[in-house]
Amino acid sequence: MAGDKFALVTGAGRGIGRAAALALGKAGWRVALIGRSAEPLAATAREIEALGQRALALTCDVGDPVAVNAAFAALEREFGRLDLLFNNAGAGAPAIPFEELTFAQWKAVVDVNLTGAFLCAQGAVALMKRQNPRGGRIINNGSISAHAPRPLSAPYTATKHAITGLTKSIALDGRAFDIACGQIDIGNALTDMGFKMTQGVPQADGRIAVEPTIDVAEVGEAIVHMASLPLSSNILSMTLMATKMPFVGRG
């Protein structure tokens, strides 16, 4: 059991974020939740509280530095410290030809996937440095696309490759302050975003094919495992994917 450990999960109203928040609550963590939509966050908070754990719902656009600063101030007032950040909030762009992407579509993905991860990590690092005892852990949600792209996915793929660089930089810079940072790269979790895998998605050879998926609860369990290690140990990179999905040899 985590005991008096405090976690923050972004994008916690749905999908992977919700699954991670619930898994952490079951493991004894007190969990703060960030997301843009109040009602899904409140629903996740109620489920965590039903487990006997404390939950704090904070409506916030992770791409807005003012909103992120306010969310971290509220978290510090309520919890007093932060032991884990799961940087999960993410967005994608339409699967259209590269030259047809608008700047607005590009920027919307960068704002959430990269800028949002940066801002939340920055807030977490600052708090982890000054709290007593100091230190904590950051887990960034990368993706299979941090290694190999899907067709017609340049904004998403670019941001997820960038997350790998962000993860390694935080892991290096955080060492002296007992801050560990790792990344989980997930392939085909069955969420609202991942449901399209069951209907058929473009492949590198031009085909449309159904792909295997994994239960999103398994991702939550993986986050709990990464979070349960002592700060002297770090899973820098974990890949969790459907065994039979096309990744190795994706093309």
Please provide the spans of the model-predicted regions.
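Substrate-binding pocket helix/loop in short-chain dehydrogenase/reductase
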Residues: 96-98, 105-107
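Active-site helix of classical SDR
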Residues: 121, 159
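The beta1-alpha1 cofactor-binding region of Rossmann-like NAD(H)/NADP(H)-dependent oxidoreductases
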Residues: 39, 59-71, 103
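C-terminal helical subdomain
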Residues: 183-184, 203-248
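Conserved glycine-rich cofactor-binding loop
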Residues: 13-15
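Conserved glycine-rich Rossmann-like NAD(P)H-binding loop of the short-chain dehydrogenase/reductase
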Residues: 29-43
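Residue(s) in the substrate-gating loop at a strand-loop-helix junction
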Residues: 143
